[in-house]
Amino acid sequence: MPLKPFEAIVIGSGATGGVATQTLAEAGIRVLVVESGPDLSAQEALGSEPINSMRRVRGLLSGQHRNQAQHPGYWKHNPRLYADERRYPYSTPKDQPFLWTQGRQVGGRSLTWGGITLRLSDLEFKAAERDGHGHSWPISHQDLDAHYSALERQFAIHGNRDGLAQLPDGCTTAPLSFTPEEQQLAAALQGSADIEMIHSRGFSAHQPSPKCPWPPSSSPGSSLKTALSTGRVEVLSGHLAERLLMNRDRSRASGVVVIDQRNGERIKLEAPLVVLCASTIASLRFLLLSERSATEGGFEDPSASLGRHLMDHVSTCRFFQVPSRSGRASLQELDPTSQLSGAGSFFLPFGSLPPQRSGALPFSRGYGLWGAINRFDPPWWLKRNPDCRLGFLIGHGEVLPSHQNRVTLSETVDRWGVPIPHISCRWGTNETAMVAHMHTLMNEAIALGGGEIQPLTDLVMMPLIEPIVGNLEAMKAGAPPPGYYVHELGGAPMGNDENDSVVDSWNRLWRCPNVLVVDGSCWTTSAWQSPTLTMMAITRRACQQALRPENA
């Protein structure tokens, strides 16, 4: 247990926790990072084959990963990076499944992040002013611009400057090349009046080496590593953050209560600043427990809306094949940068103004289509048509905030006696109409590129696992349940008025300003872009503001 005093406690060590810790430590602040999971080595975290495959089988048979196995990333990464659902349970209504992916280890879900880095535009930040749904954000792109730029430079993000209103340009290095089949699709789409194809923006695929064992997109390979190098950071792993400690008049937090998961002991840790980066649902549970705490008074939420307006991105997927333009040889063996990654892929970035088909759009807000061709092909002898290359398109769209979609505390408690989160979330008519439009544009784009849509199991032979893969949510025609896209957002939104938001424009709890809420829970709307870069930019901005003398 740490004995030295700390000036800040950061809860969570993933994408936002790493940036919070780096920002504070580089400014001279002594930081304690609280992480519920273990501190793994890079070799332990990444794993290897066939051991990872054996762990997947065990995770499925034991029930450890019953829900998380629905996500394609589970089949790509070491299953050890997905929390045991029996140890960290949650509940849902029977008719409202929610697929919560939990990354409980130092590095959190940054170790399984796909590495796409997109900025939000004011079309998203101020969408409510345009259509009247919900509230606009209290910040704009200009407020985050410098923080976006600093992070893009630090991470050496790949991408073009495309000059799109719906996708602001960043400080990027050269984009990764399209595969030959992607080049063919891009050329075919140039004949379309309203379907534009751009290089995706993000990280390239990680190639582990002794010099770079961690993925640069992960906090252990970037922000957290930089923070630890200052000598002002200590990581307390294996401890679950339960709730805030409050002062007598409930105006400020004095620290947090954590649970040592080895023995269940509750420990009080004190610091003048608390930064909450535990991921949306875990952070909402922490805040709900803190709000209701009888022994310490709890903090006040004037809006009485904590936990409400939970969102994810609504998504749907189509697999297809196109004639190979590069023979049967593996492109990835010839060029490792051609592996599927945040930068090794493409976007059809429709944004808030998708092309109209058959009259006015039957939904509000927007979406993008992310895709790739010839970046994840199995060996040619496993393909049903070995002279074709495989592709996919995945839509991810903005979800309207709904008062009914929420996280509450269940009457059921976990092994440490803490109420588990109860998640109530379902798609509405707007999301259903958006998904139908996604299908129309997917079909159109793939047809223009000479592709043929088929179920993945009709494209690839999968000995032994075909029955499992065929039943995955990603294989179904419609939209998977909320949580599937691992972009859960909202529940403690930013705002300009304490009566309709949980945190202010600097991410401070309205009635407890030395607590910052900076992960996805602070989002006012979901936007349509991949959220992680914006989460990190919000975190950097909030932590820099907290360091100013007037906030001491």
For each of these PLM feature ranges, what is it?
Residues V57-D84, P89-L99, R104, G114-R119, ...:
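Conserved redox-cofactor binding core of oxidoreductases
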Residues T23-E26, R30-R55, R243-N247, V256-S330, ...:
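Glycine-rich loop(s) and the adjacent beta-strand/alpha-helix scaffold that form part
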Residues A83-Q102, V106-R109, W113, R119, ...:
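FAD cofactor-binding and catalytic pocket of flavoenzymes
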